[in-house]
UniProtKB/Swiss-Prot annotation:
Its EC number is 3.1.-.-. Binds 1 zinc ion. It comes from Ehrlichia ruminantium (strain Welgevonden). HAMAP family: Endoribonucl_YbeY (MF_00009). The gene is ybeY. The keyword Cytoplasm applies. This is Endoribonuclease YbeY.
Length: 157
């Protein structure tokens, strides 16, 4: 089950039908990762810089906003609670402008990035970064979105 909370109402004027948009991205990713049949519980909060900065400081001791934060809970198994993903629309908009890409594409990328984190992927070491980025690229391609790493350095919170 995918639970979506629109904490920051500006999401409605930026992404058309944000709850459906997010649900489709996560569902597609779970299907392509061959784990949709597990029916995991995933909570997604569509937020802003104020909330993400607060959470980033509280949990990572970084007093600044970020694009995505993930909080993994259970390991993958039937109907487990995989975790929560928080997105900041403010940061995503600014990064989309800086990267000259559609906000929808960048939002898809950061949703997938957050999903992979709650599935225990990370980018702390070069090999893990390569694996994680490779999966992101494949999942984005399934959504018709080009490789975000072609002409830029990676963006990580």
């Amino acid at each position: 089950m995918i639970e979506i909370n629109v904490y920051y109402k500006k999401w409605y004027s930026t992404i058309k039908k944000p709850k459906i948009f997010v649900k489709n991205v996560i569902k597609s990713s779970l299907i392509n990762l061959n784990i949709y049949e597990y029916k995991p519980i995933i909570s997604i909060v569509l937020a802003n810089n104020i909330l993400l900065q607060k959470l980033n400081y509280e949990y990572r001791n970084k007093n600044k906003p970020t694009n995505v934060l993930s909080f993994p809970y259970d390991k993958l198994n039937k109907k487990c609670n995989l975790g929560e993903i928080f997105l900041s629309l403010d940061t995503l908009i600014q990064e989309s402008i800086d990267l000259n890409i559609p906000i929808e594409h960048h939002t898809c990328h950061m949703l997938i990035h957050g999903l992979l984190h709650i599935l225990d992927y990370n980018h702390e070491e070069p090999l893990m970064q390569y694996i994680m980025e490779s999966i992101e690229i494949k999942l984005l391609d399934k959504l018709g979105i080009r490789n975000p790493y072609v002409s830029r350095e990676t963006i990580y919170p």
